[in-house]
Amino acid sequence: MAINVRPKETLATFSVSSIGTGVAQTVRPGGSTHVIPVDAAPAFGGRDSAPSPISYALAALVSCSQVTAQIVAKDLGIKLESFAFELAADLDTAVLVGGSRDADANFERVSVDATIR
């Protein structure tokens, strides 16, 4: 049995633009005044002056989870007070650091512990 809590299907385009040198860059979300600084740890050729792309990817996972939970809860008439997430992900750095063609550049395991009140 399928339940459609959002009767109208919509498509939204999201965009970003960036400028940078080396592994550091400044990302600007389209239609926003926000600026997202990005850098990498020295092991990846950066200066660690800002969160890494991996940190932002993991932050996006928990942030999207919270936003999605809040939207679905609202549609179902459920009030959610607070969220706490702990996320861990395994990544084989052989591709990123060593250029290995035998390794997988994707997260191998992602675990999320969420506490929702």
Task: Label each residue range with its predicted role.
Residues 1-59, 69-117:
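Extended beta-strand/beta-hairpin segments
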